[in-house]
Amino acid sequence: MTLPRPTSPHIRGPLRTPAIMRLVLGACVPGLFTLTWLYGAGTLLNLAWAGLVALACEAAMLALRKRPPGMFLKDGSALVTALLLAVALPPCAPWLLTLVATGFALIFGKHLYGGLGQNPFNPAMLGYVVALVSFPLEMTRWPSPGSAPGLADSLHAFLGLAVQPDAWAHATALDVLKTDRSLTVDELFAADPAFGHLGGAGGEWVNLAFLLGGLFLLWRRLFTWHAPLGMLAGLFAMSLLFWNGSGSDSHGSPLFHLFSGATMLGAFFIVTDPVSGATSNRGRLLFGLGVGVLTYLIRAWGGYPDGVAFAVLLMNLAAPTIDYYTRPRTYGHRKAERGFRRGD
């Protein structure tokens, strides 16, 4: 008699680091495609150069730390940092800007603290802030979505072989809203090509693309909903609280802030970093909420049009304190403590 031999149930373990990084890279493809479609091939040049610099810095730092380069280079974390920087930097950025941002992110943002899993700050945002402070003019050169340069022009700008025309230095919607106080918001949306239907022209489609990729990662359970929802809720609440209609002194509607700048990139690909963020679910919610509130404060009254990077770094500083006050209670801990004090 033949007895049936059913397979025993198996518990599927967590994804390994290379698999997680591949999913993140894949989720960024819609945003990368949209950026390339709207702003030209400069984003792809940024990605290729940032990827090479990231791998070179990773290999050099691993050699200095006497770590096996093969295993760590294959985990994909350096490429994820390079990709996040490539989509955050202007498509017409010169090669030196991308080199400085990527090198600083890998060397000082990651390996200075011990490598993957030890960094207190998000490496990509640290590199972005360094580029923003070191290259303030170059970081404002975003081309207009309707006049994106071709591959040859993008390559010349990347190598610094040609002077960039004025059409490549178009102000973003956040720039215009922050500096132009002579027109109402409705007049700006109607007159300035930087504005689209929901947010910035082009920027709204980029945000929708990153929202799509972020929802895919959420569906694959690479992170929980707490940090993204906290950031979007904080930004929405602050913009709703200080929104005074469409007057000339308005800072924009809640919908405008949700679909402008790096909102969705930050909500689903930056604040969800498991290393530099909070660890408990309640802590992640507070962490994201703080990023959203600080992002609005910087956009409305700070010195920079978009404040996602600065907000993330400031909340990275607060993450240990958030973890301290939001530690999950150990089951039965307080009951056992009271029983011990009574002498039971």
UniProtKB/Swiss-Prot annotation:
**Predominant cellular place of this UniProt entry's protein:** membrane
For this UniProt record, give its keywords in alphabetical order, as a comma-separated list: Cell inner membrane, Cell membrane, Electron transport, Flavoprotein, FMN, Membrane, Phosphoprotein, Translocase, Transmembrane, Transmembrane helix, Transport
Question: What Pfam families does UniProt report for this protein, alphabetically?
Answer: NQR2_RnfD_RnfE
Q: FMN phosphoryl threonine modification sites?
A: 172
Source superkingdom: Bacteria
What is known about its subunit structure? The complex is composed of six subunits: RnfA, RnfB, RnfC, RnfD, RnfE and RnfG.
Query: What name does the UniProt record give this protein?
Result: Ion-translocating oxidoreductase complex subunit D
Which organism does this record belong to? Pseudomonas paraeruginosa (strain DSM 24068 / PA7) (Pseudomonas aeruginosa (strain PA7))
